[in-house]
Curated annotation (Swiss-Prot):
Protein name: 26S proteasome non-ATPase regulatory subunit 13
Modified positions (N6-acetyllysine) in chain numbering: 298
PANTHER family on file: 26S PROTEASOME NON-ATPASE REGULATORY SUBUNIT 13 (PTHR10539:SF0)
Source species, domain of life: Eukaryota
Recorded name of the encoding gene: PSMD13
GO MF annotations, alphabetized: structural molecule activity
PROSITE patterns: PCI (PS50250)
Keyword terms: Acetylation, Proteasome
SMART domains xref list: PINT
Organism: Homo sapiens
Keyword field contains Acetylation: yes
Length: 376
């Protein structure tokens, strides 16, 4: 049995932080007000006084461990995560987290958070195989939780960092966006916002099968790059989203300086040409989606002979549905893959809806005026 009162008294006199906080901890512990004590400890472990040294490890060993069985499992793991950061040996930290996982197995959320922390440590020491297995295991558990919880953001942070490490741009793009969807952007430092926006933008451009940029373009994190030396990335993303090949080529002086983009220029050109075809289909009225080879060639900046191959590629990856008339050199589109729209695209859709409403109104007036002739 540890001497908890003695530890708390000593800490009031010479421990880190304010003596009043230590006194409050002693008071709540003595009165056995476990919920209030948990909240106080959760707040205290984030105090800057613990930024250096092993104060949190001592706090756990001499105090928290004595009543941890009375603490809400998820709150206990939240506290433990701060303690673990002071452990310099990752193997010691992993063993500690494994023991904690056993203690909180009554709560799925607590187990998920614990496993996520284990995965993060494994990623830091370069054990990619175990990290991958942990992500797969935790993802299955997350799918069984109702709605979005406080543990989702930590999981998506881990999974996106793993995919970034192994160079899987498409999966990184997906999970990094999910992470941003689970947090308040104001809680992230501007420097982190800028770094996340930049890596997300690059991943979107380079990611195989990523044709949806609307969600990123509408997210406030991208604004952190505006009016900086990385503004060109925003412009490039907008060019891709609208399938503007000419604009993309104009911006080459900027994006061409980025090594990854420069090395994948041919792949980027193919992607924006596919997006160009999607945008041409989307902006046409549903009853007028006949595209000539010449129109496609002009917009996509390719020769007429290359059009059929471009359309076949778009059809094969499911971006559009339709048929090719080789004789008349036309393409008839019947469907285009849904995407998150930017404001300009939404305005275009609004204009087309208003045009359709006007058409319907005109037809209504025509029928009204000629009703007598029609009925007789």
């Amino acid at each position: 049995m540890k001497d908890v009162p003695g530890f708390l008294q000593q800490s009031q006199n010479s421990g880190p932080g304010q003596p009043a906080v230590w006194h409050r901890l002693e008071e709540l512990y003595t009165k056995k007000l476990w919920h209030q004590l948990t909240l106080q400890v959760l707040d205290f472990v984030q105090d800057p006084c613990f930024a250096q040294g092993d104060g949190l490890i001592k706090l756990y060993e001499n105090f928290i461990s004595e009543f941890e069985h009375r603490v809400n499992p998820l709150s206990l793991v939240e506290i433990i995560l701060h303690v673990v950061r002071q452990m310099t040996d990752p193997n010691v930290a992993l063993t500690f987290l494994e023991k904690t996982r056993e203690k909180v197995k009554s709560s799925d959320e607590a187990v998920i958070l614990c496993k996520t922390a284990i995965g993060a440590l494994k990623l830091n020491i370069g054990d990619l195989q175990v990290t991958k297995e942990t992500i797969e295991d935790v993802e299955e558990m997350l799918n069984n939780l109702p709605g979005v919880t406080s543990v989702h953001s930590r999981f998506y942070d881990l999974s996106s960092k793993y995919y970034q490490t192994i160079g899987n741009h498409a999966s990184y793009y997906k999970d990094a966006l999910r992470f941003l969807g689970c947090v308040d952007i104001k809680d992230l430092p501007v420097s982190e916002q800028q770094e996340r926006a930049f890596t997300l933008g690059l991943a979107g451009l380079l990611g195989e099968g990523v044709f949806n940029f609307g969600e990123l373009l509408m997210h406030p994190v991208l604004e952190s790059l505006r009016n900086t030396d990385r503004q060109w990335l925003i412009d490039t993303l907008y060019a891709f989203n609208s399938g503007n090949v000419e604009r993309f080529q104009t911006l080459k002086t900027a994006w061409g300086q980025q090594p990854d983009l420069a090395a994948n220029e041919a792949q980027l050109l193919r992607k924006i040409q596919l997006l160009c075809l999607m945008e041409m289909t989307f902006t046409r009225p549903a009853n007028h989606r006949q595209l000539t080879f010449e129109e496609i060639a002009k917009s996509a900046k390719i020769t007429v002979n290359e059009v059929e191959l471009l359309v076949m590629k778009a059809l094969s990856v499911g971006l559009v549905k339709g048929s090719i008339d080789e004789v008349d050199k036309r393409v008839h589109m019947t469907w285009v893959q849904p995407r998150v729209l930017d404001l300009q695209q939404i305005k275009g859709m609004k204009d087309r809806l208003e045009f359709w409403c006007t058409d319907v109104k005109s037809m209504e007036m025509l029928v009204e005026h000629q009703a007598h002739d029609i009925l007789t």
